[in-house]
Amino acid sequence: MMALLLEPLQFTFISHALLISLVVSIPCALLSVFLVLKGWALMGDAMSHAVFPGIVLAWILGLPLATGAFIAGVFCAVATGYLKDNSRIKQDTVMGIVFSGMFAAGLILYIAVKPDIHLDHILFGDMLGVTIGDIIQTMIIAGLVTLVISVKWRDFLLFSFDYQQAQVIGLHTRWLHYGLLCMVSLTIVATLKAVGIILSISLLIAPGAIAVLLTQRFHIALLLATGISVIVSMTGVWLSFFIDSAPAPTIVVLFAVVFIMTFTVISFNARTKGNAHRQDLLSPN
């Protein structure tokens, strides 16, 4: 039995996939709690799609793809904020227009220049094809994001929960706003090789959503989200070996299953406690 469980580790590509899934799962989990509490789930989705034209432009200009992706992600965030602040249109509407427009522009560029980057690898990642260089680059980005969150988490927490109070006590809310968006963009860049731009939104939302269902304490939510993200990501890679599937979609499906199971159990427990309390009220003394 143990030999069967350890069988995937005999292959270098599986070891690399497990390592990069571990690396990207930590910053994704930490950010996911802030995104869920702030109500920025759609912003993460928008930025993950918006990096596509940046990747193609970076290839055309001979720049690192990660650089183009990061710049495009930041541009999406800035453009969304500017349009929201200078029009009567709500933020979710602006995000829908900006990210769909940028994604479509990326597709037009991709078809026009026909780069030697496989479209599937951009959209869905190539976790089984990662190199040591990819892992090192991802570790640097993930380490930077994790460090910033570890140092400034209290400021980001107040910014996410009570924007007005953050302004009153003198926090630079604009810097916190764009700083958080820059970290989301960096994290999306880190996940590109692993899960691609389409599936990265799951890693940026699911861990925080599951953790918030389980606890109302912020620091515990951070720990739970990180643990859930690491376990689900690595389990997805390991499971994909035995079911002959791609690791990235397997990870996303596992996140969906865990979320549904958690929601079902929490709802059932709440309903059971409510019924028990009602019976206590109705029972004769």
Q: In which residue ranges do the predicted regions lie?
A:
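Short loop segments and helix-boundary regions at transmembrane helix junctions
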Residues: 33-115, 211-223, 240-242, 267-268
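Membrane-interfacial amphipathic/re-entrant helices at transmembrane-helix boundaries
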Residues: 1-26, 274
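Cytosolic-side transmembrane-helix boundaries in multi-pass membrane proteins
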Residues: 245-285
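Small-residue-rich segments of transmembrane alpha-helices in multi-pass membrane proteins
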Residues: 50-60, 97-109, 129-130, 173-183, ...
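Transmembrane helix-bundle core of multi-pass membrane transporters
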Residues: 4-16, 87, 91-154
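Transmembrane alpha-helical segments in multi-pass inner-membrane proteins
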Residues: 198-249
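Loop-to-transmembrane alpha-helix initiation sites
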Residues: 17-20, 65-72, 92, 96, ...
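Helix-loop-helix "hairpin" substructures at the membrane interface of multi-pass membrane proteins
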Residues: 135-207
